[in-house]
Amino acid sequence: MTGLLLKDIRKSYGAVDVIHGIDLDIKEGEFVVFVGPSGCGKSTLLRMIAGLEEITGGDMFIDGERVNDVPPSKRGIAMVFQSYALYPHMTVYDNMAFGMRIARESKEEIDRRVRGAADMLQLTPYLDRLPKALSGGQRQRVAIGRAICRNPKVFLFDEPLSNLDAALRVATRIEIAKLSERMSDTTMIYVTHDQVEAMTLADRIVVLSAGHIEQVGAPLELYERPANLFVARFIGSPAMNVIPATITATGQQTAVSLAGGKSVTLDVPTNASENGKTASFGVRPEDLRVTEADDFLFEGTVSIVEALGEVTLLYIEGLVENEPIIAKMPGIARVGRGDKVRFTADKAKLHLFDTNGQSYRA
């Protein structure tokens, strides 16, 4: 089994550049998730790794071998798509065996791999069924099993859960997590726009925007220490609250004046040259707490209350023009619409970004 190395990978369609010099080193056995909004280039990058898209510039290495000009079938890669791509007239067994038959593997080897993959994915009772007799989640497991049978160097998943309903999505996500544990030596790359999938499955997450890598890191690293405003607002749901601010004091701690005049001190170091500059103050909804103390972070009027049972979302007006601040309270919050509420948060949970959106913590 092997890793994958991307060096200055670029992709253009005519005069339009869509992937801009990607550098990424994926180690053997890593589960790496590409995540980002629609149009960020994550699926294009995955297709380039698979050999389905030509590489415009840069070098790609699999197992130390440069594969820019190696056809997809020779790269040692198996891919699972959003659509299951199963042959409707073939049984589950035949669908899983098809690629090996084309490769002229022996009947004994085909049977061993198919039954091994079926046992791993709990598909053994369904081997004689046609795809139409399976649920969506079972069909996706067949597609994954077909990929396992190829014994690939690298697994590629292109939004494999997008066609499933919420309950099946959770169940299949758990199956993929178990698969990753059982095949711990196999490198896996997974594309999704769903941050829950990214946070729960990945060893490392690659956040992409407009064909650029914004940040690479472990899930909690991206959540707790976002490199910039884009990552801060993309990772986490609801998104991080961002309030315009002005830096009023610098040093090992930084003081800022928030929109509305409230002064806040953060455990974030800044240089003296930053004094007087505009900045963006950030705090996650789940890090806010209601307080009655005079030493509060900010206050505002509750415009909407969404009581979800497990949590309550409070939408606060009056701090940012045309955008409410969101507070995520555990359980049932005894707060009503129209109430004026004060909020606080631990200093360690506060973020500050410069005029270019880069974190002062980085």
UniProtKB/Swiss-Prot annotation:
Segments forming domain ABC transporter: 4-235
The name this protein goes by in its record: Alpha-glucoside transport ATP-binding protein AglK
CC per GO annotation: ATP-binding cassette (ABC) transporter complex, substrate-binding subunit-containing; maltose transport complex
Pfam families on file: ABC_tran, OB_MalK, TOBE
Record: residues binding ATP: G36, P37, S38, G39, C40, G41, K42, S43
InterPro entries in the record: AAA+_ATPase, ABC_transporter-like_ATP-bd, ABC_transporter-like_CS, ABC_transpr_MalK-like, ABC_transpr_MalK/UgpC-like, Mo/tungstate-bd_C_term_dom, NA-bd_OB-fold, OB_MalK-like
Chief localization: membrane
PANTHER family, A to Z: MALTODEXTRIN IMPORT ATP-BINDING PROTEIN MSMX, MALTOSE_MALTODEXTRIN IMPORT ATP-BINDING PROTEIN MALK
Function, as annotated: Part of the binding-protein-dependent transport system for alpha-glucosides such as sucrose, maltose and trehalose. Probably responsible for energy coupling to the transport system.
Cellular compartment(s): Cell inner membrane
Superkingdom of origin: Bacteria
Family from the record: Belongs to the ABC transporter superfamily.
GO MF entry, a single one: ABC-type maltose transporter activity
SMART domains in UniProt: AAA
